[in-house]
């Protein structure tokens, strides 16, 4: 082993049984102990020594390098001497390195000891903070403690001293001691409660006695029920004979309690109007009463609900999760759900025809809808052009102007539809019914257009103010459509029905004949060139019905299209004409055609006939036939053509032409029987 390795080894310390060093070890530690030397030496001086030693080493190395470069015999001794000096400096550097490591170890040990002390102090601090927090909680609990007597509402001090006996109040003691005063007040409260308990027992006994008397009277009244039922059954024929069905009305009123507010308002107001003004209006309630009662039942016991919900959760976890489409369909069905009960109005007409209106309430949309069913008194003949007249989806369209029943009147429904992906209520009208605005009014509902309101209260006054007018409009609409149906059946066969009351409006002989009558679409009407003026005036709408007619006499053909408003006959039909004879003539190029149109469109009041004016359309068509005769018979005859006139004059006219426009005399004067200008 080399001498350097011996120097690097730490001195061996032998300890005796008591853990103390031996004398030999103490002598070695006294001679050489670098750990002790570290405490004595100054680190700055060691650092300076380190720098000086490094400089000396650099110097010696450069000198040795110079000597080697020179070469020579004398320089070898000098190089060896300098090597020895360099080794001494290396030994010094090694010692300084060991001293630096010892200092580092001592600094780490001191830092570790200081850290342990800090951790110990920090742990003590945490324990003390926990104790402080625990004590604060205990103090808070003590401060928040409330005795039971604080929850008892005691009588006031003045009332206590005025009512309590002296044996309990003890004013000589309690007036100065608040604790004794509270105890005395509690004693007085106990005494009062004992007295009230006695009174309570007496009241319970009295209650039991009264309940027994009530049970006896109930049994007596129940024994009368079979007799009353037999009396009611015996009075049913009398009620039917007098048209006073009290029993049925009573059942209806019992069922009406389960109606939603809008249907209830409709039922009450319609029943009141029927009893007061219109005996031919029958109001009934239909639907499942049990389901309606279930809607108002209070929820069952919470425990049962919890057990049911747990069972449902277990089942749903086992089932497969429904897809998004199925969830949306379920939400739509729930959104469009109707109330189990509905109100039916049956309007009877004089001729025996009935109009059945069934009103439904959509609970989540908060709107009313109606479905229509028509029962004619007589079997109607089939007429192709009358196909949509009695269509349940169209017969009530535009009962009030602009109310086609294709959109929801509640603005809040738009936001509800957006959430579940419903684009329009029109797709579900065939199933739910039409939500006309007048239907909402009959139910007392009013929806402001400026702001959506999810909850609207049914108003009895609103329903009552519109009930009579709406019923009259409904009955008039049914009668007008039935009358039009019969008229269309005759028109399709080329016959124009004119009643006896209206015979005086036309001459005895009308030669022109109706040869064609059929229905056309709105698009077909728009495509005709001679309907442009009517379209520009806004007199033709999609909700109207359109018909084509052809009147012929000889080679002349009068083509006409009719705009039939749903409000016929309050709103008259509008005619547009085109004559095919010696060219095509219309109101745009022939003033007489324009005058013919005005005779039926402007002076329609002359053709209404007896009220309510259901013969207006057929009278207008008959007048067109008469006007075509006048037009053709007053036309100039070409003398260059030989042979008889195609249209010989048979009408008496005071003057054939008038004015620069050369208009013809189209006004018929009864009873003189001649034609003149207006």
Curated annotation (Swiss-Prot):
GO biological process: cell differentiation; mRNA processing; mRNA transport; RNA splicing
Key words of the record: Cytoplasm, Differentiation, mRNA processing, mRNA splicing, mRNA transport, Nucleus, RNA-binding, Transport
Pfam family, any one: FmiP_Thoc5
Compositional bias per record (Basic and acidic residues), positions renumbered to this chain: 14-37
Disordered: annotated segments: 1-37, 294-329
Biased composition (Acidic residues): 301-314
Localization: Nucleus; Nucleus speckle; Cytoplasm
Any Gene Ontology CC annotation: cytoplasm
Cited InterPro entries: THO_Thoc5
Motif Nuclear localization signal: chain residues: 7-10
GO molecular function: RNA binding
Its biological purpose: Component of the THO subcomplex of the TREX complex which is thought to couple mRNA transcription, processing and nuclear export, and which specifically associates with spliced mRNA and not with unspliced pre-mRNA. Plays a key structural role in the oligomerization of the THO-ddx39b complex.
Self-association state and partner proteins as the record states: Component of the THO subcomplex, which is composed of thoc1, thoc2, thoc3, thoc5, thoc6 and thoc7. Component of the transcription/export (TREX) complex at least composed of alyref/thoc4, ddx39b, sarnp/cip29, chtop and the THO subcomplex. Interacts with thoc7.
Family statement drawn from the similarity comment of this UniProt entry: Belongs to the THOC5 family.
The protein's name in its UniProt record: THO complex subunit 5 homolog
GN (gene name): thoc5
